[in-house]
């Protein structure tokens, strides 16, 4: 996955991923055309927590779940459960979004 081939949701007057032009060579675009409409699942993971079933059952409304990340630390962005990028949480018009700050290359998943 080349960094210049990725498009992402951008906010504040910029294009959304669905509106962004696809910048691929003619041969590459023709080769990939059959998969352009295949849906993918994108997840932005704020952090993770481990606990026992007993601790889980004690959680209720108002409980605080402490995550393994610090405030301001990059979050992981997954496409179909595969880590592809890291980013920062942003707020735009009362909605959450993610600004991608790092593209993860194959084999650099650490």
From Swiss-Prot:
Subcellular location: Cell inner membrane; Bacterial flagellum basal body
GO molecular function: cytoskeletal motor activity
Gene Ontology cellular-component terms listed: bacterial-type flagellum basal body; plasma membrane
The keyword Cell inner membrane is assigned to this record: yes
Membrane topology: Peripheral membrane protein
InterPro entries hit by this protein: FliN, FliN-like_C, FliN/MopA/SpaO, FliN_T3SS_HrcQb, SpoA-like_sf
Pfam families assigned: FliMN_C
Listed SUPFAM superfamilies: Surface presentation of antigens (SPOA)
Coiled-coil blocks: none
GO biological process: bacterial-type flagellum-dependent cell motility; chemotaxis
The UniProt record lists the keyword Cell membrane: yes
Protein name in the entry: Flagellar motor switch protein FliN
